[in-house]
């Protein structure tokens, strides 16, 4: 194919990146009108023919995320309706990529299974089975058997009497109890509900838990939905960079090419960081360890890992402070103060093996003395694995949003003797007060790519503290190779 058959449209999320990608391809962005109607609906008009053309639509998932994504969907649909031969969505930062969920079928049924031997409860309502199977099952008594025992207990076998219709109040009560026993297995009793019987509170609670066993708390995660929306709009291909979750392409039924910022990051470390040979690559959490070790191995540098124990432990306390499933913590009479207690392990060789940082939420000193020693506390542990004393540390992460992770990691590294801390990030979203937090943190320099516009970052932190690395060369080369039917595997290791 010739490059004359290619058409590149750009959304309004990142016009600067669109221009740079087109400069690398030595073409001009195609003309498109982007706007909104008075009621806020997206309005798009294509100003160039796309019939039988290879169309690439560049739109990063930043800014007003929902508006930009809807704009992308309408652009894809418009190009497909205008007889484009192929439409590729180029999303340097794929929005909603941090919300992957379990894949589900097109009808909405989750593709999830549980080993049958792990089920320890009967289905409600129960599966119909023959009475012989119910009575012969070891360790189980059916409702019919209990009814049979109740009837036999009222019959005198030595002096048999004619069976009469029971009319006494006692017999009526017994029959009512039997009916209640039979109906209990089919009517769920919610603990604390209006139908709750105090005598059967334990059984009802067990029944309620059994019915909801295996039920996933319905926190909606839009991973599969985003993939289906792009496919339904008419996208034939997706190009993105440094996906937060590597399993995300599995949600698509169209090809997905996930590019990497690793070659550009390695090039920056080699040419822009003094004495990088003695630096340490640091992963701020266990999830990014594979990404960080890939750079460390390629540059033959040391590696360190910061492990966060997110599951808080409730220590022994009064009964009213016990946290159960679905419960809530009692309101503290005083604000909680976070105390950082660092412990440093040193060996005879002088190397620091594992440094632990304990974060304990306790009350202030004045309130602690007045409380009992067994008051409830939460303990959260952060461990640094690796030697960073007198070393330059480079924190490598794919995405920064609130910046809590990298700022806490930088503080821990400085506490453990690091001389300088760099933060090398692919996608800098920086929502809320993230930039203010970074400005007050121990991060000496922030290196970030331009998959998301960084004008506000440069304005707030200054050019002396921020370096923006350009990824348009990798994305442009990927578009050229895909358009010409060439392999893009070289871009994963060597870049453009």
UniProtKB/Swiss-Prot annotation:
Primary enzyme class: transferase
GO cellular component: cytoplasm; ribose phosphate diphosphokinase complex
Phosphoserine: residues carrying this PTM: 123, 183, 332
Record-linked InterPro entries: PRib_PP_synth_CS, Pribosyltran_N, PRibTrfase_dom, PRTase-like, Rib-P_diPkinase
EC number(s) reported in the record: 2.7.6.1
Domain of life from the UniProt record: Eukaryota
Residues annotated with Phosphothreonine modification: 120, 127
Entry-linked Gene3D superfamilies: 3.40.50.2020
Principal subcellular localisation of the protein: cytoplasm
GO biological process: 5-phosphoribose 1-diphosphate biosynthetic process; purine nucleotide biosynthetic process; ribonucleoside monophosphate biosynthetic process
Binding sites annotated in the UniProt record for Mg(2+): 242, 244, 253, 257
Compartments in which it is found: Cytoplasm
Chain positions with Phosphotyrosine modification: 119
Record protein name field: Ribose-phosphate pyrophosphokinase 5
């Amino acid at each position: 194919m010739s490059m004359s058959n290619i058409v590149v449209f750009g959304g309004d999320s990142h016009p600067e990146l669109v221009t740079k990608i087109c400069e690398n391809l030595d073409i001009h962005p195609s003309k498109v009108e982007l706007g909104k109607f008075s009621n806020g609906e997206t309005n798009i008009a294509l100003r160039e023919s796309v019939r039988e053309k290879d169309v690439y639509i560049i739109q990063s998932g930043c800014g007003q995320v929902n508006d930009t994504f809807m704009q992308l969907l309408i652009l894809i649909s418009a190009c497909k309706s205008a007889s484009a031969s192929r439409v590729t969505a180029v999303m340097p930062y794929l929005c909603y990529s941090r919300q992957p969920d379990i894949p589900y079928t097109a009808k909405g049924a989750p593709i999830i299974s549980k080993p049958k031997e792990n089920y320890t409860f009967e289905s409600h309502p129960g599966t119909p089975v023959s009475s012989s199977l119910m009575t012969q099952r070891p360790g189980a008594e059916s409702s019919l058997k209990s009814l049979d025992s109740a009837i036999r207990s009222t019959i005198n076998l030595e002096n048999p009497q004619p069976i009469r219709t029971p009319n006494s109040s006692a017999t009526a009560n017994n029959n009512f109890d039997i009916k209640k026993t039979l109906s209990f297995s089919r009517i769920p009793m919610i603990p604390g509900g209006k139908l709750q019987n105090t005598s059967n509170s334990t059984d009802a609670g067990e029944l309620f838990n059994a019915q909801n066993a295996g039920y996933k708390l319905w926190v909606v995660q839009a991973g599969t939905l985003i993939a289906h929306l792009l496919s339904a709009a008419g996208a034939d291909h997706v190009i993105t960079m440094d996906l937060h979750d590597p399993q995300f392409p599995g949600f698509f039924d169209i090809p997905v090419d996930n590019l990497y910022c690793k070659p550009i990051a390695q090039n920056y470390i080699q040419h822009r960081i003094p004495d990088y040979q003695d630096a340490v690559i640091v992963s701020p959490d266990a999830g990014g360890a594979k990404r960080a070790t890939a750079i460390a191995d390629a540059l033959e540098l040391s590696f360190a890992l910061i492990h966060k124990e997110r599951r808080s432990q409730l220590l022994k306390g009064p009964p009213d402070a016990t946290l159960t499933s679905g419960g809530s913590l009692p309101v503290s009479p005083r604000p909680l103060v976070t105390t950082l207690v660092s412990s440093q392990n040193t060996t005879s060789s002088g190397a620091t093996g594992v440094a632990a940082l304990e974060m304990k939420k306790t009350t202030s000193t004045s309130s602690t003395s007045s409380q009992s020693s067994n008051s409830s506390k939460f303990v959260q542990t952060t461990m640094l694995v690796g030697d960073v004393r007198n070393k330059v540390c480079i924190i490598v992460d794919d995405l920064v949003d609130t910046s809590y992770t990298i700022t806490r990691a930088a503080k821990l590294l400085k506490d453990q003797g690091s001389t300088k801390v760099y933060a090398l990030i692919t996608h800098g979203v920086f929502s809320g007060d993230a930039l203010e937090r970074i400005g007050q943190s121990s991060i000496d320099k922030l290196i970030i790519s331009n998959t998301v516009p960084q004008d506000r970052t440069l304005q707030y932190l200054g050019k002396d503290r921020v370096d923006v690395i350009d990824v348009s060369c990798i994305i442009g080369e990927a578009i050229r190779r895909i358009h010409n039917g060439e392999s893009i595997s070289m871009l994963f290791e060597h870049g453009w």
